[in-house]
Amino acid sequence: MATVIVGDSESFEKAMKRFKKVVEREGILSELKRREFYEKPSQKKKRKERAARKRLLKAMKKKRVAL
């Protein structure tokens, strides 16, 4: 859970900016968007396969550039 302790002299805008960074870093919004609607098991499997393929291609591309 994202928590931000606001100091006495800290402005609301700065605290809000820090809170947004923490939320983004923890992936709360992306998780919320992913869980917004029911995802069928077949769709979940396809999404995971696409992500794995994307990671593999990225690793291959990185390896090719290094050579």
From Swiss-Prot:
This is Small ribosomal subunit protein bS21. One of its GO terms (cellular component) is ribonucleoprotein complex. One of its GO terms (biological process) is translation. Belongs to the bacterial ribosomal protein bS21 family. It holds the Pfam family Ribosomal_S21. Disulfide bonds: none annotated. Keywords: Ribonucleoprotein, Ribosomal protein. The keyword Ribosomal protein applies. It comes from the Bacteria. It comes from Hydrogenobaculum sp. (strain Y04AAS1). The gene is rpsU. The keyword Coiled coil does not apply.
